[in-house]
């Protein structure tokens, strides 16, 4: 079954409202084995909505439209859908009585324009709305096609979809539909183009499962996807491809599916029984925040230093003033001293430090905005896989605005810790 999603509302086009319904409906339909080929956002204009719905019905079996079911003049979805499907609107007395009761129970008088919400295309099925006044509608179209209208507010759309639309689609499939099963592999320390180049042969011949790379902030994700009757069958089909990718790029692969980089680093620290400390300047505590966002992080994280000013670097971390004078705060020697000071003063097993120029000001020709210095100091470890003692430093030039530089720096700091714990830091 091929579906098209239509989202109605000028506020969506203006960016005043985030269209979370698009993500929700796409995910739900994928789980039901329904292919979504198109998504369209259209404003509150009858002519344009008429054209969009007509085109959708010409190329899809199922059209789901959300929004525009309210009582005001710009709520036009019901009327336009009735026109496009050739089904005249008729007042539903039962729906009207229910709506009058809904208002009476809340001590409110029903306005005359609310009667519009009780107009139903002839032959359509009404989908009850337990959260609001706008019922959904399931309207038959030419052939075996159907147009489903859902309210725009997510708090009304989601329960209506789950209670009425999902069971209808499952029954319509005539058995166990093939569902979309995916595995997301998460990489750090490698770019999208380099990863894609190393998988060129696999991507050139992909049929089932499919491979789709997409870039995130300082990360790359690979989505492996197949259709199967259930998750077990799907994951079994994905497993050989995943194993091949891991054999090629396991050094950069930190996790899968919903595991984040802070979770992956925390898992490695916990497995080794080690603790981490942070010393941050330009990131302002972002690395420590991400680490402590993970429940149970107190097992491996105890101390984080935010030393934004040079005075704080000296007093809290013991960075020598002459080092700051000679090299500047954004330098590998200072980053090394920050990491070593955090290691010594926290008692942790490993410490990571970040010092950079996030912008928009502060850059120079020698050290432009985006220059970030990193350092990691480790005490070393013999058991559970030996780790060397020492201090390592590196410098990156990161792109983006102030927040972008800070976020990319935080990702790289965590990636540096991961590399050390896995023995890749050299």
Swiss-Prot record:
Pfam name, any one: CinA_KH
Xref: InterPro entries: CinA, CinA-like_C, CinA_C, CinA_KH, Competence-induced_CinA, MoaB/Mog-like_dom_sf, MoaB/Mog_dom
Lineage: Bacteria, Bacillati, Bacillota, Clostridia, Eubacteriales
Protein name: Putative competence-damage inducible protein
Disulfide feature: none
Family under the similarity heading: Belongs to the CinA family.
HAMAP family listed in its UniProt record: CinA_B
Source species of the chain: Symbiobacterium thermophilum (strain DSM 24528 / JCM 14929 / IAM 14863 / T)
